[in-house]
UniProtKB/Swiss-Prot annotation:
A motif (Phosphodegron) lies at residues 70-76. This is Programmed cell death protein 4. It comes from the Eukaryota. Changing S457A: Loss of phosphorylation site, and loss of nuclear accumulation. Abolishes phosphorylation by PKB. It comes from Homo sapiens. Up-regulated in proliferative cells. Highly expressed in epithelial cells of the mammary gland. Reduced expression in lung cancer and colon carcinoma. Keywords: Acetylation, Apoptosis, Cytoplasm, Nucleus, Phosphoprotein, Repeat, RNA-binding, Tumor suppressor, Ubl conjugation. It is found in: Nucleus; Cytoplasm.
Amino acid sequence: MDVENEQILNVNPADPDNLSDSLFSGDEENAGTEEIKNEINGNWISASSINEARINAKAKRRLRKNSSRDSGRGDSVSDSGSDALRSGLTVPTSPKGRLLDRRSRSGKGRGLPKKGGAGGKGVWGTPGQVYDVEEVDVKDPNYDDDQENCVYETVVLPLDERAFEKTLTPIIQEYFEHGDTNEVAEMLRDLNLGEMKSGVPVLAVSLALEGKASHREMTSKLLSDLCGTVMSTTDVEKSFDKLLKDLPELALDTPRAPQLVGQFIARAVGDGILCNTYIDSYKGTVDCVQARAALDKATVLLSMSKGGKRKDSVWGSGGGQQSVNHLVKEIDMLLKEYLLSGDISEAEHCLKELEVPHFHHELVYEAIIMVLESTGESTFKMILDLLKSLWKSSTITVDQMKRGYERIYNEIPDINLDVPHSYSVLERFVEECFQAGIISKQLRDLCPSRGRKRFVSEGDGGRLKPESY
């Protein structure tokens, strides 16, 4: 009945103000109104009581809904709830009052883990918390007793022949740059060489044959350091057996391969990584001409070492390890051999073999000294052709050429004491070099010239001095 009464009141609200416009008036109107209200209520409950009950119920619902949200506010709804109930009015809850409130409006939070909590949602636990060891269930259908004492280890597959050459070639080429044998040994230990250990000396020697003398010296040192750590003496013997077998193919790319391999064998015997009877084991059993030449070269070097020559000097000392006096002698011999043979390409090759590009100014200096001390035109022309060829091939750089000429310019007064006509010869040679494009105009203009000596009787301007007595 209450629900039906509320629906009827919603459709036809019994407002006393609105009933004032009815057709009845006076006491009849009031009596009719009270009779209608009593009929509508049914239970003889006044309409004002129903309206007041509805307002109070609505205020209670709002109070329960907002109690959790506004629990932290200073002026909560509960403080004013009793006043609202007593007055019959609702307290408006505008969203503007919660504009800067960072708390969740649903009252449940965002579901994030606790900050600094121990064991909350998404947290591993307190620092230092030890978890229990997971015990294996023996009755588990998937239980395997072999897994209890199982030790796992990283397995590196052995290298095949193609991967071996592709992997080790950059390692050896980088070694020629830094020269650190320990780094190469560490990198080789990380690889599973397997049966390819004997291929390390073969590949290193093959690359050194195409390089310089310093590279061959570094290769001999590398083989000596790797023997005993990465490979054994047996692996070294197998590698040199393969080198002697492959000498015909190596000689196609490097004609001097037989002599160089013989030097490698002699150095290996001297370092103790090859036995002394290695060469004797090949006597009378070698049919290859190149292999026989290599063994003969090694035999000669070993016999020389018995007479006092060190076996570690088979490659010489290359690059900056050579002394200045030794380099000066080598350059002087190079120029003298060139003047005898006239072979410019051989002279250029010998200069590159010295591996001292920072010392090429010495060749320019010694060559010009030979021109100044010569008496014929052949030396003048041959030295000019040599410097021109070295300049065009960029064997001698601009700085080295300039430094060699400047040394001559600074020492020409002392040279002139031993060579009287050195000034005139130098001026002529410098002019020819400028015409050939060897030196620049600025360097030519720096050439010193010696003026004509005046006689005692000549004064300034060539006039005779007046008698002063």
